[in-house]
Regions:
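Feature marking well-ordered beta-strand scaffolds used for ligand recognition
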Residues: 1-465
Length: 465
């Protein structure tokens, strides 16, 4: 492997164990790719689509990754005119059944950290856009749009589409504080229709005399502690597993798609999730073929915090193994281990690295196997996590009580200036920070990093089995 993939300047090295970097792509040099999706054409070509909602541009980045050693950047695909829709971003997307579905937001990303009521009258899109990839995967064809009904809000965040007629959304909804679960029928993609929804009882503002809320308010810690859907609402059969921030894990029954019902709940606060972290309960991932759900508490990017500024202890943000053989009694059975610190790493651990105090360290996004996406790895004995500053971590979960980390990759720090950052204007350290990961059916792993491009890796050594 060429040295260029280990370093981006003197003293700016990456760290790797049981993995090999096949390639790196900066795309067009404009950073901002966040959630990624793969699509495999009938001819066997692999395309990577990345939602971008920060840096210098919004929309979707498109690359061909058929040859993992030579990815080809195709284009930056703009969904809406940024001059007409200056606050509209595309933080998330899903691809299945030849359709690309994009989350539209006017309050996600850095904007969610500050109050935005003065922007509420600006033209925006908040919902989902639907495109066809079948005709030309390099030029998505617009089919339709569905609006969530809450202007200048987060709109839609991380969601699930596994093919078929239903899209499962984490979504804003009028009269509800925070995002709820909404189900949209796209049988006619030109005219999407909502067919069902579910919410935590405390979210229904109109159910309380005199209660009001502001959908444009900043996502301060007090809001993050509340029960609201981060997503995705992860569907397996007639059950849905929901990471619901302060409320923890919800298990829902959607045998009747028009009337989701709560089956079980497991709360993880106050023991887990730190005061300054992101989504208190972020992801709920059911492992293929097993009665197990992997649940995460989101950490946070250290660059949001001035060095030495955090004085109070931060509770553990971690990855948890939950047994759901009885959906009414989801049970915590094991904790994932702390990420291995490389021997030559310049900091003693990931909690204090480069921050001079304990930061809200923790995991972020997981690889999400879905049976409607046959081009993805579907293993139920492996978990892949982009762990913010701890990089990509791969776990062997064949024994759910004895979880083993088997590989990692921490990229070099990005070379972008603070002004070029995905999240510009924040005072903290700009370490390498992995955001999302996806694994294809050939075993190639793709990760993207904050203020950087994407890496394609493959397992080696003990991880290659």
């Amino acid at each position: 492997m060429a040295d260029m993939f280990y370093a981006k300047g003197p003293g700016n090295n990456g760290y790797i164990k049981n993995l090999e970097v096949c390639s790196f792509s900066e795309m067009d040099g404009n950073c901002g790719m966040f959630q990624m999706q793969l699509y495999k054409t009938a001819e066997g070509k692999y395309y990577l689509y990345g939602a971008c909602f920060g840096g210098t541009q919004f929309g979707v980045m498109i690359s061909e990754v058929t040859d993992p050693y030579n990815p080809r950047f195709v284009k930056h695909f703009q969904l809406v005119d940024p001059e007409e829709y200056p606050t509209t971003t595309t933080p998330k997307l899903q691809i299945a059944d030849d359709l690309m579905i994009c989350a539209m937001s006017a309050g996600s990303g850095p904007g969610a950290l500050v109050e935005q009521s003065e922007l509420q009258n600006m033209k925006c899109e908040v919902g989902i856009r639907i495109y066809s990839l079948k005709e030309d995967p390099e030029n998505p064809k617009f089919l339709g749009y569905w609006d969530c009904g809450v202007p200048h809000s987060i709109g839609v965040h991380r969601f699930m589409y596994n093919g078929g007629r239903y899209v499962h959304l984490s979504c804003e909804c009028r009269s509800f504080e925070g995002m709820i679960y909404r189900i949209v029928d796209i049988a006619d993609p030109a005219h999407p229709v909502e067919v069902g929804k579910w919410w935590s009882p405390e979210q229904y503002v109109d159910g309380y005399p005199g209660r009001t809320y502001d959908p444009h308010a900043a996502h301060v810690p007090a809001f993050m502690d509340k029960g609201w859907m981060h997503g995705p609402p992860f569907v397996r059969g007639d059950k849905v597993y929901c990471g619901y921030c302060g409320d923890g894990l919800y298990v829902l029954d959607i045998a009747d798609i028009t009337r989701p019902k709560c089956v079980g709940n497991l709360r993880l606060q106050p023991v887990f999730s730190s005061h300054l972290a992101g989504a208190r309960t972020h992801t709920a991932l059911p492992l293929p073929g097993r009665d197990l759900v992997v649940v995460t508490n989101e950490g946070e990017r250290f660059q949001f915090f001035p060095p030495g500024s955090i004085k109070e202890a931060q509770a553990l943000n971690n990855i948890h193994m939950i047994d759901v053989r009885d959906p009414a009694k989801p049970t915590l059975i094991a904790e994932f281990p702390y990420p291995e610190v490389p021997k030559d790493f310049p900091y003693p651990n990931f909690n204090v690295m480069n921050l001079e105090c304990q930061g809200p360290f923790g995991p972020h996004n997981l690889h999400e196997p879905m049976d409607g996406k046959p081009w993805l790895e579907q293993r139920g004995d492996r978990v892949y996590c982009c762990y913010f500053a701890a990089g990509l971590r791969i776990y062997d979960v064949s024994d759910p009580y004895y979880i083993k980390e088997i590989a990692y990759f921490i990229p070099p720090n990005p070379n972008k200036t603070p002004e070029e950052s995905f999240f510009p204007g924040f005072p903290g350290p700009r370490n390498a920070c992995t955001e999302d990961c996806i694994v294809d059916d050939r075993g190639y792993i793709i990760i993207d990093a904050l203020d950087d491009g994407f890496y394609i890796l493959k397992r080696t050594g003990d991880a290659d089995n």
